[in-house]
């Protein structure tokens, strides 16, 4: 006999999510398997990532799964979507979302414009390979990497400031999941800077190329600032819209839209 699960479908600039309130999970579920099932485009609901959230005192805990069932440490677009959903349900405009050990301070400016204080980023973490190793990788696969830098936004990102064709982005994104280079995989950002705008495409670990990536925007913005390619504020441009990024006292602030697509019932067999 199948069970029923209430869900919400949302997206941030085309980066889409199935979102479930934990209190609606009345049975016992393997969440990794549930994520894989619901994320299927033709046999499920379809999404880039699967989100479970739960209210805890004055904040909301968010747990993120990729379409392959693996867990993710952060998602900027999902954070804006969850903030909007909570605002629509409760009227709250200032919302704290907790993901792992990171607290994200969200403010709903209006229904279509949400800002998120992502906090600081790091350019020196144990997971980051040496620059020489990255260049060895590039030479092995004959990839022209003009400028690369690793950045930790709460999840790992490699930012490549080099224009690559879509088919090459897929190849590079997949090849960079080499365990010898990045033990837990890495999100790969392909960034092109023009007129203080970053035109961005992101290969997300566990999901592949997506239409937008909020944490990728944060990481690429921070990397661009560090390398002197851009200044704050800056627009990060994706296929279906933009995010406005700025730096305040060492914190990265992301501002942009979130869209409610549907609410429904999923029949879990």
Swiss-Prot record:
Q: Does the keyword Isomerase apply?
A: yes
**Binding positions for substrate per the UniProt entry:** 15, 49, 66, 76-77, 155, 187, 204-205, 214-215
- Biological process annotations from GO: lysine biosynthetic process via diaminopimelate
Q: Which InterPro entries match?
A: DAP_epimerase_AS, DAP_epimerase_DapF
* Residues the UniProt record annotates as site (Could be important to modulate the pK values of the two catalytic cysteine residues): 157, 204
Lineage, top-rank taxon, reads Bacteria
PANTHER family tied to this protein: DIAMINOPIMELATE EPIMERASE, DIAMINOPIMELATE EPIMERASE, CHLOROPLASTIC
Q: What is this protein called?
A: Diaminopimelate epimerase
List the top taxonomic levels of the source. Bacteria, Pseudomonadati, Pseudomonadota, Alphaproteobacteria, Rickettsiales
From the UniProt record, report the name of the gene that encodes this protein: dapF
């Amino acid at each position: 006999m199948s069970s029923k699960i209430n869900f919400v479908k949302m997206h941030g600039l085309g980066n889409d999510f199935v979102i479930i309130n934990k209190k609606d999970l009345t049975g016992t579920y393997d969440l990794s398997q549930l994520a894989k099932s619901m994320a299927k485009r033709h046999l499920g609901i379809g999404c880039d990532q699967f989100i479970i959230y739960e209210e805890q005192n004055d904040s909301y805990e968010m747990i993120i799964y990729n379409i392959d069932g693996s867990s993710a440490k952060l998602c900027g677009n999902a954070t804006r979507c969850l903030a909007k959903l909570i605002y629509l349900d409760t009227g709250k405009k200032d919302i704290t979302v907790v993901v792992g050990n990171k607290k994200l301070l969200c403010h709903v400016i209006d229904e279509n414009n949400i800002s998120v204080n992502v906090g600081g980023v790091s350019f020196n973490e144990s997971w980051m390979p040496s620059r020489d190793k990255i260049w060895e990788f590039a030479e092995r696969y004959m990839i022209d990497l003009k400028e690369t830098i690793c950045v930790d936004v709460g999840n790992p990102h490699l930012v490549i400031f080099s224009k690559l064709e879509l088919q090459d982005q897929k190849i590079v994104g997949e090849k960079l999941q080499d365990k010898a280079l990045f033990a837990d995989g890495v999100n790969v950002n392909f960034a092109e800077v023009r007129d203080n705008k970053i035109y961005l495409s992101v290969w997300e670990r566990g999901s592949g190329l997506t239409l937008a990536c909020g944490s990728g925007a944060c990481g690429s913005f921070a990397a661009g600032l560090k390398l002197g390619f851009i200044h704050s504020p800056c627009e990060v441009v994706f296929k279906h819209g933009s995010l406005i990024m700025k730096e305040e006292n060492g914190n990265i602030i992301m501002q942009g839209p979130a869209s409610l697509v549907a609410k429904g019932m999923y029949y879990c067999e």
